[in-house]
Amino acid sequence: MNNPAQLRQDTEKEVLALLGSLVLPAGTALAATGSLARSELTPYSDLDLILIHPPGATPDGVEDLWYPIWDAKKRLDYSVRTPDECVAMISADSTAALAMLDLRFVAGDEDLCAKTRRRIVEKWRQELNKNFDAVVDTAIARWRRSGPVVAMTRPDLKHGRGGLRDFELIKALALGHLCNLPQLDAQHQLLLDARTLLHVHARRSRDVLDPEFAVDVAMDLGFVDRYHLGREIADAARAIDDGLTTALATARGILPRRTGFAFRNASRRPLDLDVVDANGTIELSKKPDLNDPALPLRVAAAAATTGLPVAESTWVRLNECPPLPEPWPANAAGDFFRILSSPKNSRRVVKNMDRHGLWSRFVPEWDRIKGLMPREPSHISTIDEHSLNTVAGCALETVTVARPDLLVLGALYHDIGKGFPRPHEQVGAEMVARAASRMGLNLRDRASVQTLVAEHTAVAKIAARLDPSSEGAVDKLLDAVRYDLVTLNLLEVLTEADAKATGPGVWTARLEHALRIVCKRARDRLTDIRPVAPMIAPRSEIGLVERDGVFTVQWHGEDLHRILGVIYAKGWTITAARMLANGQWSAEFDVRANGPQDFDPQHFLQAYQSGVFSEVPIPALGITATFWHGNTLEVRTELRTGAIFALLRTLPDALWINAVTRGATLIIQAALKPGFDRATVERSVVRSLAGS
């Protein structure tokens, strides 16, 4: 059994003896960077050496200096520089700068090497103050190339996010006096040992831990199997990633104060109740209600919707909030679905919640799959990472399905049952049913999302075993979705997103063809959905009522500008609307506050009767899709202020209108009076909401 620490020690001893035999030009110093400088050298590592010489011409005979190293069959990367040239490297390239910070004396003029390193450190501290963003951008580019160590089935132990390079970056930030150095020695040691043994078993320098090498590495390190090793590596990488995230946040907090920018252009804009945008960072209001159990969801939903970062102090304070009661309030469930509805931001927000111990409050099953290595070789990510990638894929299609909230919930839970001795589809279906119950979903919705998770592999099995054009294939699929059109459409989207998130070669032309054919034929068998007009009881002209924690504006009249202007002036968001046209409009608008305003019926009535408020904002452009059910137009678009009114202003005469919010998607159905042109209506709607 190989001892990685002993291997590094023996290799370093051998190399230092070799370097000590070199005859250096007078007045020069031989210094090391890279793995030798950090005492991380393996038998297959490159030697990174710098010959430092005083200002002036390069000493004679330098070319002959390196032959003993080459004769010893060592891989060498060398340079010859003056102290000024070494210092200049700090500004030239942040990757090279990190290497220069490790500069270690090997032989020759030790004082020359020490003075050079002191100047390098001083220059690094200056550079961080001036070009901190460039250092971060270099790290981000590296993460994009290599992926996160915590989430990959073939993790890059050195360059991946949470890997050895990130540990070095934390040390560099601490050396720049921008953060404290966290205690990560054990995590660093595990990654270093694993990489050392990877070199030994691969018989070459390598950073990606493939499964075939992971078996031997796990055995050498005393793990039961490679899956246990994978979990420990993921935990170590997660700790390093958390440490770096904290270090970067601390550094950002220090640097603006040094330059004076922190006190310029200070602005605070409300995003939701007790949630504000403070100069591009999401923070809590000045006096937030930390006894509100739904506050963490509102903060996370705002982050997912806007893409803004959440202040580290805000995440910490949210841990003071109590757990949600069951079933969840309707607004809390809506915020949860908003968190999952952003293709770009959902993954980042969920990971931040998880890093601060908040995600498992709402998804207690998550901890079981965190860092779990899949058994299938087709997977390139851990189960939790794959699940979030599937959610992101489904979030791209939220306007193409009738129930985007159930779609993203099913995507989140579709593989959460893995790691049990029973079929993961069955276990996951049971888990998502319990989750849907906690969220307060009705029986029909619970049944739909439970079926979605239980049958999420159905199409792949049909494609592998049956002709997708056959009646038998259609029968099998309809049986799987319980002859439910909504579930069928959700399954089609989830199947594609799941395959694309699994790995290369899973989403094939054959699977795509089978999916499209069998789903289309199954849809043709089912009856189209027939939208139903809303039920609205007769009432007086204006009122504000509360039912089960939902506030509803009741209105009867002709001037939509007037009622909607008051709602928008008070900073309320319309989450649902029910409208009937019978000479005049009879309508109900479900609303929620974006701030601490009271839902005072008397104040609302006074504002309405004043007639002062009639301005309705023009909505920002967003993704929009249209569908027809006879004379009823269904519009699905991103939830945003003013979207409902923009649509009403565009549509021809309508008999009734029904609008609901599903996650971050607004779904509006409008039954139009006969005599309209479909193409004209569609163009007008898309132009007003999507701009094209």
UniProtKB/Swiss-Prot annotation:
Residues 1-270 are annotated as: Uridylyltransferase. Residues 271-692 are annotated as: Uridylyl-removing. Disulfide bonds: none annotated. Uridylyltransferase (UTase) activity is inhibited by glutamine, while glutamine activates uridylyl-removing (UR) activity. It catalyses: [protein-PII]-L-tyrosine + UTP = [protein-PII]-uridylyl-L-tyrosine + diphosphate; [protein-PII]-uridylyl-L-tyrosine + H2O = [protein-PII]-L-tyrosine + UMP + H(+). Keywords: Hydrolase, Magnesium, Multifunctional enzyme, Nucleotidyltransferase, Transferase. Has two distinct domains: an N-terminal nucleotidyltransferase (NT) domain responsible for UTase activity, and a HD domain that encodes UR activity. Lacks the two C-terminal ACT domains found in GlnD orthologs, that seem to have a role in glutamine sensing. This is Bifunctional uridylyltransferase/uridylyl-removing enzyme. It comes from Corynebacterium glutamicum (strain ATCC 13032 / DSM 20300 / JCM 1318 / BCRC 11384 / CCUG 27702 / LMG 3730 / NBRC 12168 / NCIMB 10025 / NRRL B-2784 / 534). The gene is glnD.
